[in-house]
Amino acid sequence: MIKLKHTLRYLLVLHLFCVASLPARAVDTLALEIVRRLDVLLEDSLLRHSQMGMYVYDISDDTLLYAHNELQLMRPASCQKVVTAVTALSLLGEDYKFRTGLYLDGFRQGGTFKGNIIVRAGFDPLLSSSEVTQLIDVLRQRGIKSIDGDLLLDLTMKDTLSRGSGWCWDDDDKLIRPLYLDGKPSFSAAFRTLLRKSGIQLKGRTRQRTLPKGAECVAEFQRPIADVLKPMMKESDNLCAEAVFYQLAAHSQKPRASAKEAVKYINALIDSIGLHAAHYRIADGSGLSLYNYATPELFGHLLRYAYRTPPVLPAFYESLPIYGKDGTLRKRNLAPHAIRNVHAKTGSVTGVSTLAGYCTTAHGHILCFAIFNQGLIRAAHGRAFQDRVLEALTSGLPAAEVPQEAIVDTNKVETTW
């Protein structure tokens, strides 16, 4: 059943991409028109006092359609999450699970457990009270009514840093700790409350300790990576992004995995797709860091890689915001032909607005694109420019320019699905 589900998801995404090609003359004419439109946009007054880099690749034709300042190093902002997501799906796979374990170290004597209860953190950013209650229910099923011992929290999944490298001191984002409950880092008090509500008394105190050898895993909650990618990408959730970033780090199997370990895997992927990781700087998984530097070209290559890699594409594509429909693109509607067509990640920090993703041209060609606007007084100006680019990419030819053979009688078109 699971394999069938994955197959159907993949076929669905392929169906979205596979559009019947129109005659080559019409496609070539549209490509030239798109280039002309983008050339005109380079005269936009916004670019007189700010910087812009763009990379547009025709995946269907396997050709570079347009590039401007594509090699300039710029801050990707939350488009950094594209790098994190693609690397995670490539390295860990779409079946990867975030794991939170409940362990016992001791013995039961009647309704009392003599020993410690341990929660092993797996940096699940979405862990909820109801899910932890499911773990606690296992204790009740064993007849445990009281615990004569301590609550141990094993937080060794990641290093002890609570902020990413290059984060601003006044950022109001959540601290990155490996154990959250209902989006809050105050796990201990909430866990004790849930125990009490379940009729279990915990007599000891809370301590941070490594999981003792020989401790028994009595329950484990697992969350598919796709469930974390969706809020990470669609809503640009920074905590989810850092959680995925540290799953990469933990892949090294080293205790207290650090951001440096995650960066090594990202750099390895960049090198493997034909670019040189030394030309860029990766500092975190969310894009909050001011130390991140990348190019529009890098994002174009990563998007091409994701599109052409079956284990990556379905979960990645499904996680992207859809223009005019959901996520951080739900309120964008100034590019009519982009609505429900463009699937892309947004990025925004002070002075920066970015956009990277996929769209389909009027003649059915799949494009990947990256647009980086920097040096902005108002991010809205960058978004408006990007909307004009999207309309240029997705709208068709003016009626007077459509080659005769490109006019299709839709009444005679048969669709099978």
Segments from the language model and where they lie:
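Bacterial N-terminal signal peptides
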Residues: 10-20
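Beta-lactamase-like hydrolase cores
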Residues: 24-60, 64-73, 135-141
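Acidic/histidine-enriched alpha-helical segments
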Residues: 53, 99-105, 148-161, 202-214, ...
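Active-site SXXK
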Residues: 62, 76-95, 151, 190-191, ...
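Active-site-adjacent helix/loop patches that line small-molecule binding or acyl-intermediate pockets
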Residues: 100-106, 112-195, 223-265, 294
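A small/polar active-site loop signature that marks catalytic segments
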Residues: 181-319
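C-terminal soluble interaction/assembly domains
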Residues: 281-417
